[in-house]
Amino acid sequence: MPPRPAQTQAGSTVAEFAVALLILIMFVCAVLELARLMYLYNTLQVVTQRAAALAANVDFKDAAALDGVRQKSIFRDAAGGLILGAPVTDAHVRIDYLSLSGPAAAMMTTIPNASLPTCAANNRVACMADPYGAGCIRLVRARICDPAVAGVCNRVPYQALFAFPGLSVALPRATSIVSAETLGAPPGKAPCP
């Protein structure tokens, strides 16, 4: 069989290059998506650590201060989203105050907002009277939750940069718990009425 002329094979190189380029672009997009997902998994833990540490020193009755804590925890000075972390915003950072049930079986219990002390100085008084009482804030917890449901901490669905069929991943709750510190009360402040 005689060899084919070079003119008829000119399109095959372009077709092979196009297929190889398509596979390469899909691979690069998958690597970028995986890198972003790992970034979010690690960053959300840092976000909750920052939120819990800041909330342990902020007045729990001051809504503006708590909004500032949420904003600072996602590395912002105003309301908005986490950089490269869509859909996570400051509204996704949930801060809870916990009490301990007893020394033997120290179980953490969330204190409802209605049962929180009237001020941080009163929390000190309540904790000195009964460190395991239901109204004594001993711990501060920060979590990443879906803000659509207020009573339950549902995981936030991951929002991909590139559309991959069958990719449905939920971000972790990324919970951090720290000891309650000043809760915004300066030393020597008298209890409030």
Role assignments for model-derived ranges:
Residues P2-A78:
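Alpha-helical assembly-interface signal, strongest on the long, hydrophobic N-terminal helix that forms
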